[in-house]
Regions:
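PLD/PLD-like phosphodiesterase catalytic module centered on the HKD motif
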Residues: 1-180
Length: 180
């Protein structure tokens, strides 16, 4: 009998060890995006802050983007790099909490070689959370904020099945691309 492999990984944050899993999961997703960028990336989160994604203080990620230096790398910096090759969709709520991050993303986009690669959509009733790339869909209860990653009890699921990825992409396109 052959063992069935799964395309899905669930993580629940209630203690320090599972919070480390969430950080490592996000780190892995974004390192993969830096190496082989998706054509389109979707970040759908009611609340977003410019959280640290990569800890490059020891230089382990310096070969990816040498100009970053030995420090923590924030979400906006990763998206700014990815926007040169990919379209980045960000969907959020109209909340002052998001303003700083969204303005930073708009400024980085304007200063880039591909200013049209950032698409921001604001939805009053947004509660869905997800991060979607070419070959993954991270979904669950977690907002991409410090509290979402480090404080709150959350549950996330990383799904790599083509069916789930396609379903999420269709949903995001139908509901959040029309504002463009």
């Amino acid at each position: 009998m052959t063992e069935k492999t799964t395309d899905n990984r669930n993580t629940f944050t209630t203690q320090a060890t599972s919070r480390a899993e969430i950080r490592e999961l996000l780190e892995g997703i974004f390192v993969a995006e830096l190496l082989v960028p998706s054509d389109t990336i979707w970040l759908v989160s009611p609340w977003i802050t410019d959280i640290d994604i990569l800890d490059n203080r020891c230089g382990q990620f310096s070969s990816l983007v040498p100009t970053w230096g030995l420090r923590r790398i924030r979400l906006s910096e990763i998206f700014a790099y990815i926007m040169d090759q990919s379209i980045v969709h960000i969907v959020a709520r109209p909340d002052p909490h998001n303003d700083s991050f969204l303005q930073k993303m708009r400024d980085l986009s304007k200063a880039s070689d591909s200013p049209d690669n950032l698409r921001v959509v604001i939805r009053d009733t947004l509660h869905l959370k997800g991060l979607l790339g070419q070959d993954y869909y991270l979904s669950g209860s977690m907002n991409l904020t410090y509290n979402g990653v480090e404080v709150n009890h959350e549950g996330v699921s990383l799904d790599r099945s083509p069916e789930s990825i396609a379903e999420a992409r269709i949903h995001f396109q139908e509901n959040y691309e029309s504002d463009q």
